[in-house]
Amino acid sequence: MSKGAKNHHLKSNVNEFLNNKRNIEALTNVIDSFKNALEKQIPLTTVILSCETIFVELLRSHDMTIHIKSLQGKENSPENNYKQFLQERYIETFNLIIECLGSDKTSDAHQALTTCMKFIAIEGTNPLESHDNHQTEFPIVHLNKVISKLLLSHRIMKNVIVKLSEYTMFDDFCYFVWKLLLKNLIPTTKNDLNNEFIQNYLELLNVLIPASPNNNQKYAEQDDDDEKRFLCKVVKFDQQLLRKNVNKIWNFIVQWPHNDVTQRQLLVLLLEKVLVHLEKPALLTDYLMDTLDVGGQVSLLALQGIFILIHKYNMSYPNIYEKLYAMFEPEIFHMKFKPRLFHLADIFLSSTYLPETLVAAFAKRLARLSLVAPPQDIIIILFFIGNLIIRHPGLKRLICDAANGGHEISNDPFLMDECDPNKSFALQSSLWEIQLLKSHMLPYISQTAKNITSQPLPNREWDLGEYLEVKENDVSIH
C-alpha cells in the first residue's frame, strides 16, 4: 500500500470512529497503524495527530469519564465497561506516544511531546474519573512518564527537552516537574546515573530555572487565579519554592560523577541559572577551587564563578592569581575559550593596587607566549601587555631595559616554569620579546610592537573587546 493510500485509510478510520464511537474496529485499526509505524520506523507525525484527534474528542466529550458515586464506588455496567475499554486504549496510545519522544526525527519527537502535553492539559480538566466532590487533579502519572522518558533515555534528549520551555509559563507544570525532578535525584539503580541521565537532568534544570529571579513572574500583574497561569490545576509556585528546590537539587547534583562534558554543563548551569538562587554561595569555594585544576574550558568556567564570588559576594581567594597564571600555556591559542580567558584575566588584573611583581610576571609570561602565538593572538597579547604597563607605569623599565639591550636571551632570569608568579624574577627581566616583534614580517604586528615600546604610552587603554569579540556577560562556553 502506498503512503498516500495508507494516510487515506488512516483518516478514514479516524472519521469512522468519530462518527460512531462504538466502532471498536476503526479505533483498533488506528492504534495498529501506530504500532506498525513504530515497528517499521517510518514517519510518525501523521499517526500521532490521528490518535490525538480521537482521544482529545473522547476526553472533552467525557465519553471515557466514569462517574464514581460517594460510598458506592465504580458501578459495574456495560456503559462503564466500555468506558474502561476506551481508557485502556487511551493509556496504551499514550505509552506509544511516549516511545516517540526518542525518535531520531526531531519533528516526530516534538509532535509527540506536544500531543502528550495536550492530553495532560485536557485530562486535568476532564478527568477519566469524576467524583461527587469533584476537584481538578493534575495528571502527574502521565507527566511522570514524559519526564522519565526524557531522563532515562540512553541518548541525549536536548532537542526535545528544550521544547518543554514552552510550558514553563504554567505554574502547575513547573510545580509538578520540580516534584518529579526531586523524586529522580536518586535513580533507582546505579546504572541509571550515567552520563546520558546526568546531561538530560541538567538540561531539564536549564529549562526550568529562569535566568534571573524575576523571569518567572510573567503573570505577576495578573490575578493569582488567572487561568492563563495554569495548564489545568491552580497550584502555587513562587520564588520561595523555586529557591528551595534549586538549593536542594544543587547539593545533590554537584556530588554526581561528572565527566568533562557534564562538568562543563554543570558549571554553565551554575553561572547562568543557579548561583543567584543559592542561599550559601560561600559553600561553592571548595568545589570551584578543585575544578580550577581540571584544565581547559572547565577551569575557565570555574574561574568565572570565582570572579563572581569575589566581586558580588566579597569573598577572597589567596592563590587565585597563581591559578590564573598557570592557565596561560601555548595550548590556549588552539582552544575556543581563549577570548574568555583574556577577558577574565584583564578584569582580574584591572586593579592598580596589585603588586608590580605579580603584574610583571603576567606581562613577561604573555610576552614569551607571543613568540609562539598565531598573528591574530600576538596583537591581543601586545595590547594586553600595553594596558598592564599603562596601569602600572613602574613596568616601563622592562621596556627600557629591553631597548638598551636588556639581557642576553640565554641569561634571562625569568623562570617560565615557576608556578608562583611572584617568584618568577619577572621584574629582574625585560620584555625583549616585544623588541623581537618589532622586526616581525607582518607590518601590522611590527608596528603594534613599536607602538607598545614607544615612549610615552597613551593615557587611555586599548580596547581589547574589539579584538576578543566577547561580551562581558557571555559565560556560555560550550
Features from the language model and the residues they span:
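Eukaryotic scaffolding regions of large macromolecular assemblies
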Residues: N314-H478
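Alpha-helical solenoid scaffolds in large eukaryotic transport, assembly, and signaling factors
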Residues: M1-L324, F348-S351
